């Protein structure tokens, strides 16, 4: 393949290429049509309609996408017509604006599809307000509404056609991203095995926890893509079998990579003068690179080779372990057992990587069902909406904040009558987020992006007055907005600001829009921030104990599930995968909550240090439990009374801690028998089986971890303030 063809292939395979090309085709079609007719007047409205339709787009199959497009167009038409009819009546208009914003925000309880449609509908309604404000002529407003709906319909039709032509491409893209994130996770995990004394392991563990958030998000997005294409029946066909196997392989990699077989500090101290930990680190790092290469192979649809370096690194590790065993050091006996399990874990990853090219083999005997939490009937949808219609629901409070903030913004417009003031409402809509931390971050990005976009627009209009060039620049800016709007919002804001000014400059003097746009952004951002700060604020610190309780509760359920498989035999079935995914999702929720707390006012944060200590300890707990899951196989656990006692003691302690956290009570006092039981579990007989040895060791490690978990939980609860009960909105 020639270099130019290789470059085009890589560009086409890029995750954003499909989305960007759809937007480019839709916008360039309208641009060419308006240019051909020598009439640029409809272009801004056509662009805005296309943008609203693209914002409403979510990943789905052909039938689902068709339903989404039809629902979007109906919502767009109803919203735009309501704006035109009520615009001259301030009080009914304000009431309708608040009710519509609240109701459309509450649609998010039904899932991502409805949340996107709701956000896009409010956005198009504000676009219609801007049109009414500029022309004050109902006939012109109806014409621009029709143009916006035409732009939305054209993009919707293109989106449906694209889904039919490239039905499985989104699944490949998400699998490729998943393996890339897993590769980065493995490389960060490898850094923990560097046997360097006095190293800041806490910073490395926090970096690993942040990457774990990305891995879990990638797993959830990939599962949603598979569900939308192949359903939840668990009967994949020949073509979809490849995607199912790769997804389950990624889940297994994540469990193996998350596992911890012994405290890293103890391993580093014991084997400081050996190369065994460097061998572990090298193999894990190479496996991370192999995962990234597998993701690239999935994206480019190329073959994948595990690589000779990985095989050699595995052999080197085994030889290093063999040398240590030959030393017959009694102090290393237990640690060498943990290292042997670690080597077996890495060997499992290596084996599956070497078989990745055979991933289209039959899925006989594998439970391929997936949990689908989306509502599919009117009864399920009604139940979701009823749960969201309570003051304790985060979505209810967010919708109320947006509604009241929009009323405040509209009242300010009626009192001050600023030029082009409806951009204030648009800023409120995009800046106001469910949490104060997210709102604060979005405000900074919006203001900085607006300043950058206004500066770029002024410079480009000064340097290049040619209309044709303005059209091309507006098209490029719109494309940049969609490519960056989810990952780099500051750049996306600059791009959409540039596009807006260039489009309005085609119809008049774009320079007069610069200062009003900046002023409206500042006013809207201030109102959105005040709403997040004053109207039923959702401080993460006030409900941190609930998030921590969920972490402990899901860990307890997972422990029960995994030990059941040691007694009854390994089954990678749906209940086990649900318990594992719930545990990881709870861990991610704690990481996200603590990250949001860092952006909250000092008085609302609570004890951040205790929260991060608890996060580090809960990640360690997750690692110990994942090690049990990674090596699960049937073993005679019922014959070992200490294992039964250890399981009962751990489950009782974790259940009590979860209940105390949920109620914001101090953790139950430690039982003196816990330490004695942990010591007894660590006394391993010579003839004990490998699986029983593992279960004993992991239960003992968890028992040793309990005092630290209780202390961190008590410190967090002692400084937390009461929070209202939170109802699930999804």
Regions found by a protein language model. Give the residues of each.
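Long, hydrophobic alpha-helical segments that serve as membrane-spanning/inserting helices
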Residues: 1-24, 28, 32, 36, ...
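Membrane-helix cytosolic exit motif
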Residues: 527-540, 544, 560-567
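Catalytic-loop region of hydrolases
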Residues: 615
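Alpha-helical transmembrane segments and their membrane-interface boundaries
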Residues: 1-166, 170, 333, 337, ...
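C-terminal functional regions that serve as terminal interaction/effector modules
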Residues: 467, 475, 483, 490-498, ...
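Residues on a specific face of well-ordered alpha-helices
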Residues: 101, 105, 152-156, 180, ...
């Amino acid at each position: 393949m020639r270099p130019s063809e290789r470059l085009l292939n890589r560009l086409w395979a890029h995750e954003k290429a499909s989305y960007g090309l759809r937007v480019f085709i839709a916008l360039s079609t309208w641009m060419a049509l308006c240019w051909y007719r020598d009439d640029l007047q409809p272009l801004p409205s056509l662009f805005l309609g296309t943008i609203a339709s693209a914002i409403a787009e979510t990943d789905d199959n052909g039938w689902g996408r068709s339903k989404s497009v039809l629902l979007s167009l109906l919502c767009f038409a109803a919203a735009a017509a309501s704006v035109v009819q009520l615009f001259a009546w301030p009080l009914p208009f304000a009431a309708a604006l608040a009710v519509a914003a609240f109701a459309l925000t509450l649609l998010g309880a039904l899932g991502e599809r409805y949340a996107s449609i709701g956000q896009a509908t409010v956005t198009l309604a504000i676009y219609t307000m801007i049109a009414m404000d500029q022309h004050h002529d109902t006939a012109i407003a109806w014409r621009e509404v029709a143009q916006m709906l035409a732009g939305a319909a054209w993009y919707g039709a293109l989106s449906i056609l694209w889904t039919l032509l490239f039905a499985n491409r989104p699944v490949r893209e998400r699998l490729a991203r998943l393996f890339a994130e897993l590769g980065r996770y493995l490389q960060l995990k490898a850094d923990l095995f560097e046997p360097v004394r006095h190293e800041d392991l806490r910073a490395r563990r926090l970096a690993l926890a942040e990457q774990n958030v990305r891995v879990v998000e990638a797993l959830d997005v990939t599962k949603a893509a598979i569900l939308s294409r192949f359903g939840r029946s668990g009967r994949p066909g020949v073509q979809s079998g490849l995607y199912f196997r790769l997804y389950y392989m990624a889940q297994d990699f994540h469990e193996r990579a998350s596992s911890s077989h012994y405290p890293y500090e103890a391993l580093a101290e014991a084997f400081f003068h050996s190369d065994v930990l460097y061998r572990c680190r090298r193999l894990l790092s190479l496996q991370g690179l192999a995962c990234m290469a597998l993701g690239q192979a999935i994206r480019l649809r190329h073959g994948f080779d595990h690589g000779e370096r990985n095989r050699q690194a595995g052999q080197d590790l085994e030889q290093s372990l063999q040398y240590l065993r030959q030393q017959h050091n009694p102090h290393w006996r237990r640690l060498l057992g943990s290292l042997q399990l670690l080597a077996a874990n890495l060997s499992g990853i290596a084996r599956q990587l070497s078989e990745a090219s055979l991933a289209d083999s039959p899925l006989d005997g594998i439970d391929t069902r997936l949990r689908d939490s989306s509502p599919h009937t009117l009864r399920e949808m009604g139940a979701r909406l009823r749960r969201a219609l309570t003051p304790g629901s985060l979505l209810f409070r967010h919708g109320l904040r947006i509604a009241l903030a929009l009323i405040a913004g509209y009242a300010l417009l009626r009192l001050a009558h600023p030029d082009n003031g409806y951009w204030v409402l648009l800023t409120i809509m995009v800046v106001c987020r469910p949490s104060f931390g997210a709102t604060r971050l979005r405000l900074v990005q919006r203001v900085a992006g607006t300043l950058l976009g206004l500066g770029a627009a002024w410079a480009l209009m000064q340097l290049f007055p040619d209309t044709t060039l303005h059209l091309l620049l507006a098209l490029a800016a719109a494309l940049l907005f969609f490519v960056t709007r989810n990952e780099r919002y500051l750049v996306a804001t600059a791009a959409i600001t540039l596009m807006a000014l260039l489009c309005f400059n085609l119809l008049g003097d774009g320079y007069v829009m610069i200062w009003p746009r900046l002023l409206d952004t500042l006013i809207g951002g201030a109102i959105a921030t005040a709403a997040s700060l004053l109207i039923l604020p959702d401080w993460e610190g006030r409900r941190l104990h609930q998030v921590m309780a969920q972490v402990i509760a899901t860990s307890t359920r997972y422990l029960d599930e995994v030990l059941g498989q040691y007694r009854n035999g390994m089954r990678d079935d749906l209940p086990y995968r649900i318990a594992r995914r719930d545990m990881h999702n709870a861990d991610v929720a704690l990481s996200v909550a603590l990250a949001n707390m860092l952006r909250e006012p000092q008085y609302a944060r609570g004890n951040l240090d205790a929260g991060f200590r608890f996060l580090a300890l809960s990640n360690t707990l997750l690692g110990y439990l994942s090690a049990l899951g990674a090596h699960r196989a049937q073993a005679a656990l019922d014959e070992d009374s200490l294992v039964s006692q250890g399981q009962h003691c751990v489950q009782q302690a974790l259940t009590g801690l979860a209940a105390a956290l949920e109620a914001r009570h101090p953790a139950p006092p430690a039982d003196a028998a816990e330490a004695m039981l942990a010591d007894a579990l660590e006394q391993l007989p010579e003839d004990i089986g490998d699986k029983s040895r593992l279960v004993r060791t992991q239960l003992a490690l968890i028992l040793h971890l309990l005092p630290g978990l209780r202390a961190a939980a008590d410190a967090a609860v002692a400084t937390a303030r009461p929070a209202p009960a939170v109802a699930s909105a999804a």
